[in-house]
Amino acid sequence: MLFRSKRDPAQYGTVTLAEIDAQLIALGKELGAEVECFQTNIEGEIAERIHRAHSDGTAAVLINAGAWTHYSYGIRDALAILKCPIIEIHMSNIHAREAFRHHSVIAPIAKGQIAGFGADSYLLALRAAVSAAQQA
């Protein structure tokens, strides 16, 4: 997400990560949920943040793992220890793109996957996560 502006706007739109984060925080307040946004290009940092979620009372995790979706067993294994709902997010429809993007190592352990709605994928995922956490 850090270099979204350098990627194909037809796939990812033109909204910035800061704008998505602000929309998530605002929607979280509306839904009565505290939202923490985290972004890194370092796989180990994602795994460490996920491990922290295991012990800090995180009620749900939204994750857009980008290309790591297709091959990162480290991120998958970190997510697998969580007891809270996990929602996998993709701005583009990964199932309508190149064949190598169709497979997700995260999907089998996620509560659900939201893809193809651009930046709205994040907002839809937050609504789903809040609902799932309330039912858990």
Give the ranges of each region predicted by the language model.
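Active-site-proximal loop->helix
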Residues: 7, 75-77, 82, 97-106
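Short, small-residue-biased leader/transition segments that mark boundaries at the very start
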Residues: 1-2
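N-terminal small/polar loop signature for handling phosphorylated ligands or for N-terminal nucleophile
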Residues: 39-63, 67-83
